[in-house]
């Protein structure tokens, strides 16, 4: 993996795996109430994430607090993956 190849050079390789985040790119989905609700229901918090909620994870992985973390995917998906991970689109 890239993490194992670059680790000896002190490079850490990690990723953030966000759930559904309220951004301009997701506005088309958000504008359709059935679809918005279907995505929100997959989070254990029953809502979409804000961009601000992604920042802490990025800061952590970029900081010295994660100096021994590499080759990791950090799921910031409101529990979607832990609860189920599947998506059933609304019937419209």
Predicted regions and their residues:
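Short, conserved catalytic or interaction motifs in soluble domains
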Residues: 8, 18, 63
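Rossmann-like NAD(H)/NADP(H) cofactor-binding core
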Residues: 9, 14, 72
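C-terminal helical subdomain
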Residues: 15, 34-65, 69, 76-78
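Short, flexible catalytic-loop segment of classical short-chain dehydrogenase/reductase
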Residues: 17-28
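C-terminal tail/cap regions
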Residues: 66-69, 74-92
């Amino acid at each position: 993996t890239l993490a194992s190849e670059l680790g000896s050079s002190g490079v850490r390789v990690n990723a953030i795996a966000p759930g559904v985040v309220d951004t301009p790119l997701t506005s088309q989905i958000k504008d359709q109430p059935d679809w918005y609700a279907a995505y929100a229901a997959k989070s254990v918090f029953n809502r979409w994430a804000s961009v601000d909620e992604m920042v802490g994870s990025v800061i952590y992985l970029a900081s010295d607090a994660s100096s021994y973390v590499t080759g990791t995917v950090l799921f910031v998906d409101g529990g979607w993956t832990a609860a189920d991970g599947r998506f059933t689109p609304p019937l419209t």
